[in-house]
A protein has these predicted regions:
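C-terminal cap of thioredoxin/glutaredoxin-like
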Residues: 2-3, 20-34, 162-234
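Soluble non-cytosolic domains of exported or imported proteins
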Residues: 76, 87-90, 117-121, 130-134, ...
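Processing junctions and N-termini across compartments
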Residues: 13, 80-83, 200
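Loop/turn elements at helix/coil->beta-strand transitions in domains of secreted/extracellular proteins
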Residues: 75-77, 104-108, 133-138, 170-172, ...
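Structural microenvironment flanking redox-active thiols in thiol-disulfide oxidoreductases
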Residues: 102-165
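Extracytoplasmic thiol/disulfide redox context detector
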Residues: 2, 19-118, 191-192, 230-234
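Solvent-exposed loop/turn segments at secondary-structure junctions
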Residues: 84-87, 114-119, 145-150, 181-184, ...
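Sec-dependent bacterial lipoprotein signal peptides
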Residues: 1-17
Length: 234
C-alpha cells in the first residue's frame, strides 16, 4: 500500500468514524404529546481509560517470533492483534502505517495473530513463512489489498492467498514447506494461548506500552500513542 502523509490519516479517521456515527431519528410530530417536556439530551459518554496490564500479561504481548514493523528499538510499542481475513483490520492498516510515518524513530508495531475467520489460519501460516523470507510486510499489505479475492464471506478460499504472496515476491515452494513445519504449528498454538490469557475477543485489538486500548477507534489509538511518546521523551 502506498500512503500520502497527513491527508491520508484524516481521510481514514473520518471514514472509520463514520461507521459508528449515528444521528438519532426525528420522531413523527404525532408521536409525542404537544405539551410534553422533552428531557435534556444525554451527554456523550467519556472515553474509557486504557487498562494497564499486569507484568505477567505484559510478558505475553510479544514473542520471539512476533513480526515487528517500524523502529526496532522504538520507545513506544504498539501491539496489534489482527486477523488477515478481518475487514476492520484491513481498514486499520492505513492508520497503523500513519503511526509509523508520524513516529519513525519512536514507534514499533508488534503483530500478533488471531484466526477468527475460516481462511485465516492458512493465511497466518503463509505470513509466518513470508516473514522467514523477509517478505512479511509486503505480503500482509498484499493480502489486505486483495482481501476480497481470498477471504470473501460468500466464498473464502485461502489457496488464492498463495498466488497473492507469489506476486509479492515470495518463493511459494519454499514457503509452503515452511508453513507446514512443526514450529509454525507451535507458534499458532502459542498465539491462541496468549490471546485467551489476554482476553482478546475482537480484531483489531491494540495495546500501547502494556496498556489495553479499551475504546475502539483511530482517535483513541492516536491519542494514547501521542501520550506515551510524550512520556518517553521526558
Amino acid at each position: 500500500m502506498k500512503f500520502s502523509g497527513k491527508a491520508l490519516v484524516l481521510f481514514c479517521l473520518a471514514s472509520l468514524g463514520a461507521c459508528s456515527r449515528q444521528e438519532p431519528a426525528t420522531p413523527p410530530a404525532s408521536s409525542a404529546p404537544p405539551a410534553a417536556v422533552q428531557p435534556a439530551p444525554t451527554p456523550p459518554a467519556a472515553d474509557k481509560a486504557p487498562v494497564e496490564l499486569s507484568p505477567e500479561l505484559v510478558a505475553r504481548l510479544e514473542r520471539p517470533h512476533s513480526p515487528v514493523l517500524g523502529a526496532a528499538k522504538g520507545r513506544v510499542t504498539v501491539v496489534e492483534v489482527l486477523d488477515p481475513a478481518c475487514e476492520a483490520c484491513r481498514a486499520y492498516a492505513p492508520v497503523v502505517e500513519q503511526l509509523l510515518f508520524l513516529y519513525p524513530e519512536d514507534v514499533r508495531v508488534v503483530v500478533r495473530f488471531a484466526d477468527f475467520h475460516p481462511p485465516s489460519q492458512e493465511a497466518i501460516r503463509l505470513l509466518e513463512a513470508s516473514r522467514q523470507q523477509g517478505k512479511f510486510h509486503q505480503v500482509l499489505e498484499a493480502l489486505f489489498e486483495r482481501q476480497s479475492e481470498w477471504a470473501s464471506h460468500s466464498a473464502p478460499d485461502a489457496s488464492r492467498a498463495w498466488k497473492i504472496a507469489s506476486d509479492a515476491g515470495v518463493d511459494v515452494a519454499k514457503a509452503r514447506k515452511a508453513a507446514n513445519a512443526d514450529g509454525v504449528s507451535k507458534m499458532l498454538a502459542l498465539e491462541s494461548e496468549d490471546l485467551v490469557a489476554l482476553k482478546v475477543e475482537r480484531t483489531p485489538t491494540f495495546f500501547v506500552n502494556g496498556k489495553l486500548l479499551v475504546d475502539f477507534g483511530p482517535k483513541q489509538l492516536f491519542a494514547l500513542v501521542k501520550e506515551e511518546a510524550g512520556k518517553t521523551a521526558q
